[in-house]
Amino acid sequence: MMKSIALALCLTHHSPMVLSIVDYGDSQEKTIDSLWKKPHGSDLTWSGFSRVGVTEAYFAVPVDHFLTNPPSLRLSQTIYCRRGSSYVETEKVEEEDRDDFLKQVWFLTDNLVFFFVDIEEYIVIEQLGDTVYLWDASSCYTSKLVTIDDENGPVTSINWTQDGLDLAVGLDNSEVQVWDCVSNRHVRTLRGGHESRVGSLAWNNHILTTGGMDGKIVNNDVRIRSSIIGTYVGHTEEVCGLKWSESGKKLASGGNDNVVHIWDRSLASSNPTRQWLHRFEEHTAAVRALAWCPFQASLLATGGGVGDGKINFWNTHTGACLNSVETGSQVCSLLWSKSERELLSAHGFTQNQLTLWKYPSMVKMAELNGHTSRVLFMAQSPDGCTVASAAGDETLRLWNVFGEPPKTTKKAASKKYTEPFAHVNHIR
């Protein structure tokens, strides 16, 4: 499978910069500290790497230089761009608006970390659109995937299919674009599902589920022309989190109305009444942190925002709350270990830390510090060992959190991904 890197570019009238790129590659032998030594850029800093450490590389690279002379990225390398003086001059937006808690803009595939920085404030001030680029690590070839114009943008959510071949791009104008990232081809645009921005996306094979600012959740079958096959109605404010269970039978949603819903895939309807299996109202702030447990299929962890700060654990069969843990700060994201009974939580004010918990005792095992603003996004590497975190401080950090991956058989290791809807023709 082609190795790809997706870039997020912040385009200004002054000096466009690459914001972030990470290449995990396909080698299981390289370590995170085997990074290239001579960066194409400046402002380079390094720090140690350990179970509670981080390895980082910061760069400022002009886009025109990068597109014509892309650096040879190696395993787990981060490119980062600090805002220059031209950006600082535009700080007319309130600080709390700079890292929108509700937007889902951070994703990981087999060999790819994609970090899309929300630049809505610069689009408003500079009247600019969003551009998404793909970078092929095997050939060092960079290509523009799509530029969203001011009228339709900015990009408010992005999510990869399970095989990492197709990308869904949610927009501020209520539309969702689907892109084939192997051929850099626009497959289709989904319309009519929402009335405002699409802030959450989740794939379930050929079903793309979208969550909007209008509170609606829509299931789209991307194989058919009339894509909308069902809706879930229950949230009264923006849907800011969506996660399908591993089986694909249950969907968890979190909203700005402080509510968590559990939905059954088979109950989605174009004429909804009371559809949810369970409705949880225990949180007292917005819920965007959702994580299905990999070792107990019915277990869901949820985290509340500012004013709540709790991690709640739910039995989604019975609807019972199994435990509630006060963390002391906003819970922005949650990740389960794939090999251990551990949970990682990402937080906001005051410490902006990542916290590692032992489940089910919820004994605090470690705190990972370094971010200076709330940690909005986390994603795991394919082996589950490395976690990447992105924060409002505009840094992407890589952590060796969960230890060695579980042993896999040759049969399992040789398993190849197939495109979820490869057997049907794409519809533009």
Curated annotation (Swiss-Prot):
This is Cell division cycle 20.6, cofactor of APC complex. Gene3D superfamilies: YVTN repeat-like/Quinoprotein amine dehydrogenase. It comes from the Eukaryota. The APC/C is composed of at least 11 subunits that stay tightly associated throughout the cell cycle. Keywords: Cell cycle, Cell division, Mitosis, Nucleus, Repeat, Ubl conjugation pathway, WD repeat. One of its GO terms (cellular component) is nucleus. PANTHER family: CELL DIVISION CYCLE 20 CDC20 FIZZY -RELATED, FI02843P. It is found in: Nucleus. WD repeats lie at residues 106-145, 150-189, 193-230, 234-273, 282-324, 326-367, 370-409. Its main location: nucleus. InterPro entries: Cdc20/Fizzy (IPR033010), WD40/YVTN_repeat-like_dom_sf (IPR015943), WD40_CDC20-Fz (IPR056150), WD40_repeat_CS (IPR019775), WD40_repeat_dom_sf (IPR036322), WD40_rpt (IPR001680). Pfam families: WD40_CDC20-Fz. Pathway: Protein modification; protein ubiquitination.
